[in-house]
Amino acid sequence: MILFTILIVPAYGEPVLKEDDFVVQKFVSGIANGPTSMAFEGKDILVLQKTDGEVRLIHNGVLQEKPVLDENVTSEGEQGMLGITTVGTKVYLYFTESTHDGGKPLGKRVYSYDWNGTVLTDKKLIKDLWATQIYHNGGAMVTDLNGSVYLVVGDAGRYGKLQNHPDGE
């Protein structure tokens, strides 16, 4: 099995492997501001930067200088640019939207965009969720073989039955 790493700045040290059949290879460097997730679109990789709301493109193994999208996100706690998935040329993003980077949250939202190979265009709101907590906001996004999009929204810090414990604790 080959694991690819995307190195962020600043580096906190080299990866340490505990499995003999894993190989770590440096794929790209220079991604700042907390990459949270990535999606593969053909031979390209779209990478989310949590704190500044940018979506960066890795094309032919090279991190492109300009972002393909820059959204206003709040980045307090675990908020920010959180999840990405693709269906054909549609790209779905999940993030905590704000009026400006680092501002107060307007909501946790899912948007769809069209990917033209260069930039993300035609932004459409798909789902508007609550944004009451700065932690436990989820972020994982996947698609099934039929093109349906699934999203982990987290428990927003609301413990109890959400944890699937019979006694609610």
Give each language-model segment a name:
Residues 40, 46-53, 77, 90-169:
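Surface loops at the rim/top face of extracytoplasmic beta-rich domains
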Residues 46-68:
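Beta-propeller domains
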Residues 9-13:
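Sec/Tat signal peptide C-region and signal peptidase I cleavage site
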Residues 26-32, 68-76, 127-133:
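Surface loop/turn motifs at the tips and blade-to-blade linkers of beta-strand repeat domains
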Residues 14-32, 123:
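A short helix->beta-strand "capping" segment at the edge of beta-propeller domains
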